[in-house]
Amino acid sequence: MAEMKFKFTIQPYQTEAVDSVVGVFAGQPFNEHFTYRRDVEIKRDVTNWMLSDEELYMGFANAKVQLDYGQLLDNIHRIQGRNNIKLSDSLKSGGLGVCSLDVEMETGTGKTYVYIKTMFELNKLYGWSKFIVVVPSIAIREGVQKSFETMQEHFMEYYGKKARFFVYNSKNPVSYTHLTLPTNRE
């Protein structure tokens, strides 16, 4: 019996939501190779024995936002104006990065689709490839994981690549350091 596959229809309101988030960073240069020195206990093993010492201790992260406060706020004002939203007086970050963005969508409108597509667009336009999705419950976590699995072929068709994802296990955080290795830049 053939496997049932979902066919996703691109909705204009979803595209507008993605464009709004991506537009916040208009003017950000494309940079896909931001490196840093990893500060973890690293030991040679079967997964990294071929790497040089330099590669072994080098990690990969998204490039820092190069836009200044004024550029970001101008971009946000432009998007708020386009969406008939009251203009923000200032950027809000809560100490987590340069600014916090709030995308509000009704239940059942495709929020998960929107943020996965947003990740692909941020990768395409700015080279960013590391994203963290935080969810409030196990049930939602399972649904998000299933969405990533279900939408892989759909996004492969549009972007020519698949999202590599995993569910974080706080009982074994060291097992995720491999994601910062040079071989995991997608």
Task: Place the predicted regions along the sequence by residue.
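Conserved nucleic-acid-binding Ia/Ib motif block in the N-terminal RecA-like helicase ATPase lobe
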Residues: Q145-Y176
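Conserved small/polar residues in nucleotide/adenosyl-binding loops
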Residues: T177-E186
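Walker A/P-loop
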Residues: G97-Y115
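Walker A/P-loop NTP-binding motif
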Residues: Y113-Y126
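Conserved Walker A/P-loop ATP-binding site and its immediately adjacent core
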Residues: K130-M151
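Pre-Walker A adenine-sensing motif
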Residues: I79-G94
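Helicase-associated low-complexity/disordered flanking segments
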Residues: M1-R82
